């Protein structure tokens, strides 16, 4: 069976391995050869009655306990082959057998930051540096004694085997901090290292292997058992995507060459400018609810109207395109979709066997659909709404079959081979790494959007478990409440990624890019356009208007 080919297998008594498939493989090659491209950071502030001393005392053991529940945080995706060549084609998990190995893993994975650094500063640092050593999938920081702000936990993870699941990992760590068994253990033995020695049991690979994350392709084959016709249908979608990318398109222009002294940076570390930007716009919970209501009445979704606003702003502000001769450019939409639409159980955040569930989507908006006969690219609000409906219809048409997943394996194999071949040749030629990333990217970046949906999670944690309750005014016992939260990304190539996510009732639109390659002021303006148009659209809908059928 196809699914069995990609399953986890015990290759030695304490080592499990499986092939990386599709987008996983593509991301692993990009991360390795493109200086940590696509790596993620997610942060939560903690409101708690635990002292700093207790947080620090419990943190490492809490993360160790989470590994027992979610062994994915111990996976690796860079290894070596028998001839010592680098292996980027497999994920591995090594079951820890000694308490010394366990303590080493804790020391390298659960890091306490207590030098005054704030959570916001630390996320800037994590997004501006690649995770070391290469292939490590997960590291988590506890920020205490910050110059300002409450304590915080920040996960810095590879995107290869992570996505929505990071929220579940964070919540599980928070729960572990107030777990009654951990509290009792440290009351009896206050030294965390001694406490670990008193409870350590070697990991049982046979027990853990069933909890390790499977590939999206494995889940797809198990669920749908595709026929030859189904697989052909998937490759037709791939052909459509390639055809769309060849059509003349608007986009965000990169600079003429990588900036050696970027105008916009977030400071320097060890003499190196921090130029990985995460420009963010946040819509609060009250306004977000109004937006959702308005869009339901208009018969559009929030992601589709945001995408329309991004596309229109790029069309108005950026005069660059890939058109030749007398061609009029449309818009090639390069976006990611989540496979939960086809595999809801397999990709469910808190019990998901599939952690990387991204599918590459595509659509092309023609010049006539993109612009108004009356207003050109200066669309009215009604015309923006029509553009949003057009984008939604095209996305629905492209994503009308789960068999698109079948083509992702070929995409992963071909793109990863291309990434490796190009990077190796450039390294052999002595090309500057930033110049290499610049040269490997298109002259313009087509309109992108990755919409991650609304991520809801319990925010109050006590020894009794997690709940949806608000932070208590007076607590009967220990608690940790998840306050402000945000996510960040690392985009190292010459592309601009717009990411949309709902967190705790708020809506956040973030743009990830490197200011060595793009004008940060231009991208700020695009974000401002989106926010302004969103608000104008919401105000055009009467309060008593009925909902439209989507």
Swiss-Prot record:
Q: What top-level class of enzyme does the UniProt entry assign?
A: transferase
Q: Where is this region: Peroxisomal targeting signal type 1?
A: 548-550
Task: Tell me which positions the record assigns to the signal sequence.
Answer: none
Pathway(s) where this gene product acts: Secondary metabolite biosynthesis
Q: Which UniProt keywords apply?
A: Acyltransferase, Peroxisome, Transferase
Q: Which domain of life is it from?
A: Eukaryota
Where is it located? Peroxisome
Q: Which GO terms describe its cellular component?
A: peroxisome
- Documented applications: MELs not only have high potential as eco-friendly biosurfactants due to their excellent surface activity, but also have attracted considerable recent interest because of thei runique properties, including self-assembly, anti-tumor and cell differentiation induction activities, and moisturizing and hair-repairing properties.
Gene Ontology terms, MF aspect: acyltransferase activity
What EC number(s) would the UniProt record show? 2.-.-.-
Q: What happens when the gene is disrupted?
A: Abolishes completely the production of mannosylerythritol lipids (MELs).
Its domain description in UniProt is: The C-terminal PTS1-type tripeptide peroxisomal targeting signal is required for the import into peroxisomes.
Chain's role:
Acyl-CoA-dependent acyltransferase; part of the gene cluster that mediates the biosynthesis of mannosylerythritol lipids (MELs), surface-active substances that enhance the availability of water-insoluble substrates. Mannosylerythritol lipid production is responsible for hemolytic activity of Ustilago maydis.
Q: Which family does the record claim for this protein?
A: Belongs to the trichothecene O-acetyltransferase family.
Provide the protein name.
Answer: Acyl-CoA-dependent acyltransferase MAC2
What is this protein's gene name? MAC2
